[in-house]
Amino acid sequence: MKKNLTEEELHILKNKGTEKPFSGKLLYNKKKGTYYCKGCDNELFSSKSKYDSGSGWPSFYEPININSIVFKKDISLGMIRTEVICKNCDGHLGHVFDDGPNPTGKRYCINSLSLNFNKDE
């Protein structure tokens, strides 16, 4: 895990925190590019799979490479969810749900504070 992370970023990545809905700086980002793990720069999502789910968090219907993430059952907050974790640094990214659009039917609901974005040249 990188050393130059803010307290908020560390809270999300290491302590499985969640940013407030509609507060993330990447929520409305419409630029073409790639989203990386803020903790280790692991390539995670493409802007091609990003969509507006209305949930308040950046949402994607698929990762660039399914092997770049790990899934873990999350029973916190009285709910059963599937946590999405960075495979390289074990950083908490968000959760995945089965209510997304075609072609996958998945909604990867990811915290902006756990992501970096690099615009395509």
Where are these regions (language model features)?
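A short Gly-Trp-Pro
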Residues: 2-121
